Amino acid sequence: MIWLRSNGFLLGLLAAVALAFALPGPGARGGVLHADVANNVGIALILFLQGLSLSLEKVRKGAGNWRLHLIVQLFTFAVFPLVGLLFHALVPLVWPSEPPAIRDGFLYLCVLPSTVSTSVVLTAVARGNTAAALFNAAFSNILGVFLTPVLVQLLMSQAGSSTPFGPLLLKIVMLTLIPFFAGMLLRRHVLKWVEAHKAWVARISNTVIVFIVYSAFCDSVQERIWQQHGIAMTSTVLLFVVLLFAGISGLVHLSCRLFKLNREDRIAAYFCSVKKTLAMGVPLAMLIFGKRSDLSLILLPIMFYHPLQLFVNGLFANHWAKTDPRRDS
């Protein structure tokens, strides 16, 4: 029972995918669930709740460590995207039949911001600099609302697969920026309610994400995209996700040593730099790529990366907690 509660979101994602294959009609375009309208409302709701949940007071406490902040933000919005471009160029050499949507999915994964809650929780478990982790994860999410769509356009134009930016910019403002900052402004007026209902706020966001994933897979099932590719493609994507995670993890560890960060800062820098947010990644993908029937393929890398980062980083956090020299003091 405890395992089910702690992994409810991942199980929900799996259930959404299974339901899409079993019953794609209602969630597809033109279906009875009106997914296009529901997804837009859901995107705005998620960003509103993100703004409502963000404590600027706590963020300010960790704002002073510029070397740590530089590493995290450079990895999130510079190194990761460059690695994504490298993947985009090199993977077709060893996987010639790779679907273009998978290539776009890896690029998209690489420009997403960090997670907030799990970065902070894992840093706390490993006895790292929790205040700095909160600052960097929250700051990258604020930047990500602006930078992720811009980087998607910039990198995909370099790769030859961009979409018109004008209509996208209007949707970004209407469905992400306005709800996000409305939530931030409203937070101080409903702070007690938000603090008392944190679990419900998270459940609402997770439910919307599960619905967006369901509708994305419904479209791809209706278009018979999965029949064209199958299990071999899925396994290959998982392999490249593991390679990407391992490569970035190694680069972050090396950079922390070069910058001579102390133990607590290294832990915070690592967790904030290697993690990518599914919570913001799914709604932003719907916003940027929503008209594409192969959206589920674009989401596949981040859907594999998410459980991988939780599992591996959980092991790291427990190991670092046990090897903390202050543990018995």
Question: PLM features: what roles do these ranges have?
Answer:
Residues L11, F75-V83, C110-V116, A132-Q153, ...:
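Membrane-embedded alpha-helical segments of transport systems
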Residues G247-C256, L299-P325:
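Membrane-helix cytosolic exit motif
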Residues W66-Q73, V94-V111, G128-A138, S235-L238, ...:
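The feature identifies polytopic integral membrane transport proteins across all domains of life
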Residues L251-M286, R327:
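C-terminal hydrophobic structural anchor segments
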Residues M1-W95, P99, Q153, S157-R263, ...:
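Structural signature of multi-pass alpha-helical membrane transport proteins
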Residues A28-G30, R224-I231, A285-M303:
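Extracellular/periplasmic helix-loop-helix junctions in multi-pass membrane proteins
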Residues K58-G62, S117-N129, H253-L258, L284-G290, ...:
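Helix-loop junctions at the membrane interface of multi-pass solute transporters
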Residues H88-F146, V152, M156-F165:
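Membrane-interface helix-loop-helix junctions at boundaries between adjacent transmembrane segments
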